[in-house]
Design a protein with these regions (language model features):
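Phosphate-binding site recognition
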Residues: 1-334
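A cross-kingdom feature that marks ATP-driven nucleic-acid transaction machinery
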Residues: 305-459
Length: 459
């Protein structure tokens, strides 16, 4: 089922009308291959799609030639390099798009090798593709795609041979909650919030959700079951990649469903050397598994920086599933859920709901609403966390208290929160707002209120 990605398809269509190279990248299973094939297929463009293996250049060239023989009756000749191959392709074919997916796999083969000249080989391949783009795309187009955010972004760095060679770049991200709704149309708005909080926005993940079953049954079947499709998906595509360095697991296990500052990670993990912790955090940032955030209005204060796992599904995995195999095998998925997930699942969802609220503001601004808001973030004051704080054009701030409830928010709770805000220092508070998925018992004057009808733009 293909939904969304209209802007990305439009950009690929514009690229096709030119000559040159496009770079497309994003995490595994985010839909890069599906997007590229959909865009090219809809326009009936002639294309050849090749996925690199984690092997040397010659092996990948030979595999690509084998594919070309099958798909476009290519020559039986052997080629020593991609440069020689594309020289031939440019002479013999016209108006093709050649897609080289997982370019980063081939780069990783050299970068991870212990041989002394391997890094030079990786740079040489980039130089080859520089020559291909400069000299051998006069008749065709090239798309380079990859899952390693770090490697693919490095291709566009000013020190890379490929700097300035791409006519465009597309960073493919997970679906927002609104796009996820298009893939899960049978869910109620409230259920969608809960499902998105647990499973996130990967199209691959969303396709495996059974919309006829409740959240508990989907978690048990997909994540707690020993053969669960999403449990295996995480192990194969994320967890196994981290196995060579247990410190990475340690950091993620500390962060889990929350936001952790550097000193909190340092104190709660077993990584006592600050230099080592810095390296491990950089590794997770490069892998695009975590992100570093700053408090709104405190962007220059590096001490206030905190770290968070980006993907909801991975958050859930580390919060509940990681290192729990023995318990799950002994208890079975149903009983494990009842004992270790059910008591805190609403709290877990409430934390993720805060992120969805921030996503709502971004979407609303793009739709022409809330035009006076320029930034949304989090703020800590006097041991209190303010979930969602919006900075306005005039430099003042609107503080939103976010609640994920099964019943409407009560007046006395709102009044208590408003009283507490009087003590906030450091930011100029112009207004307060309340966000509750279940609505409100009553509404007070001069206060902003948001509920699910607003989130799905139904009001």
């Amino acid at each position: 089922m293909f939904v969304g990605r209209e802007k990305e398809i439009e950009r690929i269509n514009r690229f096709i009308s030119k000559r040159g190279a496009l770079i497309v990248y994003g995490l595994r299973r985010v839909g890069k291959t599906t997007l590229i094939k959909k865009a090219l297929g809809d326009k009936k463009i002639k294309f050849v799609y090749f996925e690199c293996q984690k092997a040397n250049e010659k092996t990948n060239v030979d595999l690509f030639v084998d594919l070309l023989k099958e798909s476009i009756s290519f020559t039986d000749a052997s080629f020593p390099s991609f440069l020689a191959l594309f020289k031939e392709l440019n002479q013999r074919y016209k108006d093709y798009v050649f897609v080289i997916d997982e370019y980063s796999y081939m780069k990783e083969y050299y970068l991870e090798s212990k041989k002394s000249k391997s890094k030079l080989e990786a740079q040489r391949i980039d130089s080859e593709f520089q020559n291909i783009i400069d000299d051998y795309l006069t008749n065709n187009n090239l798309i380079l795609s990859g899952s390693s955010i770090y490697i693919m972004e490095k291709l566009m760095d000013h020190e890379s041979p490929l700097y300035g060679r791409f006519v465009g770049s597309i960073v493919l991200k997970q679906f927002t909650y609104l796009e996820a709704k298009m893939m899960l149309p049978s869910l109620t708005d409230n259920d969608l919030i809960a499902f998105y909080s647990v499973f996130g926005g990967s199209p691959y993940v969303l396709e495996r959700i059974n919309q006829q079953k409740n959240l508990k049954d989907n978690i048990c079947e997909l994540l707690l079951n020993e053969d669960g499709k999403l449990r295996n998906h995480l192990k194969n595509n994320v967890i196994n990649e981290l196995e060579s360095d247990p410190d990475l697991h340690e950091i993620l296990n500390v962060i889990k469903n929350g936001c952790k500052k550097y000193n909190e990670i340092e104190n709660q993990s077993h990584i006592t050397t600050s230099g080592l912790l810095d390296k491990r955090l950089k590794k997770l940032l490069d892998l695009d598994i975590i992100e570093a955030k700053y408090l709104i209005g405190r962007e220059d204060d590096k001490r206030k920086k905190y770290y968070e796992i980006k993907d909801n599904l991975l958050k859930f995995y580390y919060a509940y599933v990681f290192r729990q195999d023995n318990k799950m095998n002994f208890l079975g998925e149903e009983r494990f859920y009842e004992l270790f997930i059910e008591p805190s699942i609403k709290t877990y969802i409430s934390h993720r709901f805060e992120s969805i609220v921030k996503s709502y503001f971004s979407e609303s601004i793009k739709r022409g609403y809330n035009r006076d808001i320029v930034e949304v973030g989090t703020f800590f004051f006097d041991n209190n966390e303010y979930d969602c704080v919006a900075k306005k054009i005039d430099g003042t701030y609107v503080f939103f208290e976010v609640k994920y409830y099964s019943k409407p928010m009560k007046r006395d709770e709102m009044e208590k929160e408003m009283e507490q805000l009087k003590n906030v220092k450091g930011l100029k508070v112009s207004q307060i707002g309340f966000v509750c998925n279940a609505g409100f018992e009553e509404k007070l004057p001069n206060v902003i209120y948001l509920d699910l009808a607003d989130f799905f733009f139904k009001s």
